[in-house]
């Protein structure tokens, strides 16, 4: 454990940030899993609806630096291709 006041403060701030980041990452992954679940079920309408809900969340997390923008683009491209195959 830190002894210096500023190091103690940084430890507290880091733990707080870690919890927020973990929560946001979990939320994002949950929305992505919903799209995959709809694709697995073969329901194109549900998959498209889940994708439309997931897309702004992934974009927002990429903009905030939680994930890289290319990873967000890759998720969206792969899911779009899979949804289009359901036709």
Curated annotation (Swiss-Prot):
Sorted UniProt keywords: Ribonucleoprotein, Ribosomal protein, RNA-binding, rRNA-binding
Presence of keyword Cytoplasm: no
GO molecular function, one term: small ribosomal subunit rRNA binding
GO biological process assignments: translation
Transmembrane segments: none
Recorded superkingdom: Bacteria
Gene Ontology CC entries for this record: cytosol; small ribosomal subunit
Keyword Thylakoid: no
Job of this protein: Binds directly to 16S ribosomal RNA.
Xref: PANTHER family: 30S RIBOSOMAL PROTEIN S20, SMALL RIBOSOMAL SUBUNIT PROTEIN BS20C
Similarity remark: Belongs to the bacterial ribosomal protein bS20 family.
Name of the protein described by the UniProt record: Small ribosomal subunit protein bS20
Organism from which the protein derives: Shigella flexneri serotype 5b (strain 8401)
Gene for this chain: rpsT
């Amino acid at each position: 454990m830190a002894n210096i006041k500023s190091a103690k403060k940084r430890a507290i701030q880091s733990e707080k940030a870690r919890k927020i980041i973990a929560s946001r990452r979990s939320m994002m992954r949950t929305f992505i899993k919903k799209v995959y679940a709809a694709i697995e079920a073969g329901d194109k309408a549900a998959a498209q609806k889940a994708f439309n809900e997931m897309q702004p969340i992934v974009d927002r997390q990429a903009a905030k630096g939680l994930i890289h923008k290319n990873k967000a683009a890759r998720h969206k491209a792969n899911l779009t291709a899979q949804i289009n195959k359901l036709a």
